[in-house]
Amino acid sequence: MLDALLPLDQQIFGKSQPGRFYVGPTLALELSGRTAWAAGHANPEELASFLAFCGCGSVILDEGICPPPTGWHRAETLTVFGLAPGKVLPLPAVEDALWNSLTLDAQPPAMTVAQALYPTDPARRDDAYSELCSKRSRGRAVVWALQQGEQTVCTVGAYAVANGQAYMACGQTAEPLRGKGIGGRLIVQMANALAAEGEHPVFLCAPERVHFYTRLGFAKLGEYVRFAAP
């Protein structure tokens, strides 16, 4: 998964946001707020010291490759799910009347998406808007939304399409329509479309979402672990 995310982010934002990335002989880091994403490996004590220097409170890594920073504790296990290129998943059931009331927008305005994702957090909304514009203009991001009238009620995106992978994230449904299946169907539709184009859709999910993605039919590909600072 990080094979798509880190190289693409560095390629696009490395010059304008140099403090966001660190690349060493055996380790690449991307800083996102107080969270670091780590690919590769490093000395655990040196990694702990560097993350503390950067003000990080957590790091996400592949424990099979990268030993955790010294003194940090395991916070949660994150599961990688995916759909192999060319594979097709069946669409989850949704009530016909509800689904027919929705319109798919395969190119929603970036600010509309950002506002739907972060309605009460202007800083994160603006960051999401800027990043989506930068990636989509280069053909490196795909975002879909469902509209009900004038309202955006569901969205999901592939926010890093690179190196044969499509990193899917930010699946969100408006609260009144949650639990009705529209989010699951939109996720499967996008994953099927990406897989049909030869991409490998992948995404990372928290423990409480494992059952949801398993039920949709996605295959477990691996795990990352989030470690928290002492």
Where are these regions (language model features)?
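A conserved beta-strand-loop-helix scaffold within acyl/acetyltransferase catalytic domains
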Residues: 124-172
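Acyl-donor-binding surface of acyltransferase catalytic domains
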Residues: 39-98, 102, 205, 225-229
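Conserved acetyl-CoA-binding loop-helix of GNAT-fold acetyltransferases
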Residues: 43-50, 169, 173-175, 179-196, ...
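Short amphipathic alpha-helix that is part of the acyltransferase structural core
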Residues: 1-13, 79-81, 86-129
